[in-house]
Amino acid sequence: MLVTIQQTKSNIENLFEVSSNGQLLFQAKAPWMKISLPFNAEDLRELTFSNPAGEIVYTTRYKFIDNLVEESIPFKYLLTKGQRFGQFEIIGRNGSEGAFYVMQNGLFDSKFCIECSGKVYLGYSLDKGRNNYVSIYDGVKQIAQITKPLTVTDNLDVYFLHIKDEYASIIPVLSFFTVYYDYQKYNHSGELTKNTVQISNSYTYGKNNDKYNPNWIAKEFGQQAADELEQKLRKIRAQGSAQAKKIVKLVGLAYLVLILLAIVLFVVLKSTLG
């Protein structure tokens, strides 16, 4: 199953839509205003996740004390072999339903943890060229993959979530996790943008690089699904390249106008001063 998590607004507020086969499934919102407070207190602001009618399904609660204690010792994981960062509790209609956090087990060994329904799913993030991937595991079995193109226009990120049908029940949590992931890793809070584009190539190296299987989507969903994803990614890159060329032309035109104005001003001043 393919689920798309598309950021629809990045100015003044961060809004997302979660859809599948053209049907809106959920909406989400993340904090926008950039605030720097002691002990990361700005993270006390909630991420929200709602159904199409706007009814809240989940919110987050920043585990302030737990994070303060856990993160107070730099490189604690070198001694304890495990240290949690960015712990957010998932709050549902019936109270706490799980948590999101990063587990650091070594200098080159980190993973995202998704606690829900009494289980812990692990997400391994990897930059490889023009895309970022998060491979989601249930134990030793891969159950999902999140693909994010690193070409972004106007800070509007998009994520493609492929998930095995037997895990469809956790689509809401994984979709909400994707918004949390964006907030933790690709957050552009406080930035006002228009007609901008970012085109990146990036590679990350770590102990868990082998968790990414480039053939997983084709194996689980068929070659057509893999080809369709590649087409979507190529389209995004093409749109980004076109936008970049447009921006270059506009900047060049602006400089040309400034040069012409400077020449005119010089001629006027010269004639005036004799």
Report residues per predicted region.
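A glycine-rich, hydrophobic loop/mini-helix early in the fold
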Residues: 44-93
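Low-complexity or membrane-interfacial segments used for flexible interactions
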Residues: 1-46, 82-87, 98-99, 104-271
